[in-house]
A protein has these predicted regions:
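Accessory "access/gating" subregions that flank catalytic or transport cores
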Residues: 203-342, 450-458
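Alpha-helical support elements that line or immediately flank enzyme active sites
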Residues: 18-35, 298-310, 355-363
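Extended hydrophobic packing segments that form well-structured cores
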Residues: 422-458
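Hydrophobic alpha-helical bundle architecture
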Residues: 311, 322, 328-401, 413-422
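Short alpha-helical scaffolding segments that buttress acidic/His motifs in well-ordered protein cores
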Residues: 8, 12, 268-276, 319-327, ...
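Conserved phosphate/anionic-ligand binding catalytic regions in large, soluble enzymes, centered on
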Residues: 9-27, 281-300, 341-352
């Protein structure tokens, strides 16, 4: 299988890539299939079942809302986040769903959308969509899995244990960090150069660069919105947004940087908090590689652009390419789904990606980049996913800030060494996968363990 940088970084909507972006894409794919097979006009009823982690925390993650929007033909990268609430209210009050925006059917959420805690066999985030005609006969049924980071596979792909259906031949194919580093050594390339060459299999280099700078712009817009917007986050926990107030404090007292050598970390915290508060509010974010961990790479990239002399757009492109190469290793050899391996697969992976990427743009050798990425994951091993109330708020928002700072520190440690290290990136990825498999399901995005049951919702 072949994965692109744009498979790892996708423009979407909050609060969750696996529970919001994935279900929306699956729902849209299902109704597009109805139209493709000529079944849309005959459809009078659609029933949806969300299983496992989707069933357990789907309400808090907005999975139900995502499904409704997807059935109406919306996609995460283009849906107007400003009109979502009004559209959902209209669907629910009128009891009508406009499939693909062109075929209206009756829809009662209590009857037609079920959330079931029991998982389907292949993955904790399973979904079944069924369409019926006027006689009540089932005319189409599909089973989908949201496998993390907005990736969706259908039942056929799941049966073949495939992540994507892309078999595009690449100039430098790699399955492991060992393979990746071998390409770098043989051809004298950096990791970002290997990735950029591979991207040419899909599009010209100029398009790849432009696409990555667009991703960066969305990240900047998200941070700006998070620094501007205030209030209480939705969902019932009454979590107060903090980024805007922190931004005012930092701008009001810039001379503090002269007194406090660690004041730069306040800015890193700000960037991460801003992104994840926007995500929790259902705003426009970039999966990096997931929504739950969407603040780390933007925060570290903002750190690079604001505080590192000589930073520029070329560095942004190299940063994102390197981060994607590392993310692909986790995607193919472990998981980026909190429902499958806990938060080590989300915040842990994002921390590892950001660390390796920052190390490259700061001039680190390929070996130092691998070391930084390994450190970023090694010290996130065992991290649980236990969101209070099933919401991507506590501990998720602060955890992104902690992961961002940890990534920067991993780079500093790696750059002070010669690239030689005891634990390889491949071994830590394998360890993460095994740790996730051993982790009890109550710690994997079900809101049935950890903080989720020890903190009373207010």
């Amino acid at each position: 299988m072949s994965l692109s940088v744009f498979d790892l970084f996708k423009i979407g909507i909050g609060p969750s890539s696996s529970h919001t972006v994935g279900p929306m894409r699956a729902a849209a794919r299902f109704v597009e299939g109805l139209r493709r097979e000529g079944l849309l006009p005959a459809t009078t009823c659609v029933k949806v079942e969300l299983y496992g982690s989707l069933g357990a925390t789907g309400k808090g993650h907005g999975s139900d809302k995502a499904v409704l929007l997807g059935l109406e033909g919306e996609h995460p990268d283009t849906v107007d986040t400003e009109t979502v609430a009004a559209r959902l209210q209209e669907i629910r009050s009128n009891g009508r769903l406009n499939l693909l925006g062109e075929h209206s059917i009756a829809f009662n959420e209590k009857e037609h959308l079920a959330m079931i805690r029991k998982p389907l066999p292949y993955h904790p985030n399973g979904m079944i969509f069924r369409a019926f005609d006027a006689a009540g006969l089932q005319i189409r049924s599909r089973e989908y899995y949201s496998v993390g980071g907005g990736f969706v596979v259908d039942e056929d792909a799941a049966g073949a244990d495939r992540i994507v259906e892309d078999a595009t031949p690449l100039t430098f194919p790699f399955k492991s960090a060992k393979d990746l580093l071998a390409h770098c050594a043989t051809y004298g390339l950096s990791i970002s150069q290997v990735m950029l060459t591979n991207e040419s299999a899909w599009r010209p280099e100029a398009e790849t660069r432009a696409g990555l700078l667009k991703i960066w712009q969305v990240m900047q817009d998200c941070v700006a919105a998070g620094c501007r917007n205030e209030g209480i986050l939705p969902g019932g926990l009454k979590v107060k947004r903090r980024a805007a107030a922190l931004h005012r404090q930092l701008c009001k007292n810039p001379e503090s940087a002269l007194r406090d050598p660690l004041s730069v970390l306040d800015w890193v915290n700000l960037y991460a908090l801003a992104v994840n508060e926007e995500n929790a509010n259902g705003g426009r974010v970039v999966t990096a590689p997931t929504n739950g961990a969407a603040g780390i790479i933007p925060a570290v990239l903002h750190y690079y652009m604001r505080f590192i002399p000589g930073s520029n757009d070329d560095g942004v492109v190299r940063f994102l390419l390197t981060a994607a190469a590392i993310g692909i290793l986790y995607k193919e050899n472990a998981s980026i789904s909190g429902a499958e391996v806990g938060c080590q697969g989300e915040v842990g992976v994002a921390c590892s990606m950001a660390a390796g990427a920052l190390c490259e743009v700061l001039g680190g050798s390929v070996q130092q980049v691998e070391n930084a990425a390994e450190i970023g994951m090694e010290h996130n091993l065992g991290l649980t996913c236990d969101p209070i109330g099933g919401l991507v708020q506590v501990p998720c928002i602060e955890r992104n800030a902690m992961g961002s700072v940890k990534a920067i520190n991993a780079v500093r440690m790696a750059l002070r060494g010669d690239g030689q290290h005891f634990v390889s990136l491949d071994k830590v990825i394998r360890t993460m996968r095994q740790t996730g498999a051993d982790m009890k399901s109550k710690y994997k995005e079900t809101a049935r363990g950890g903080l989720a049951v020890n903190i009373i919702e207010c």
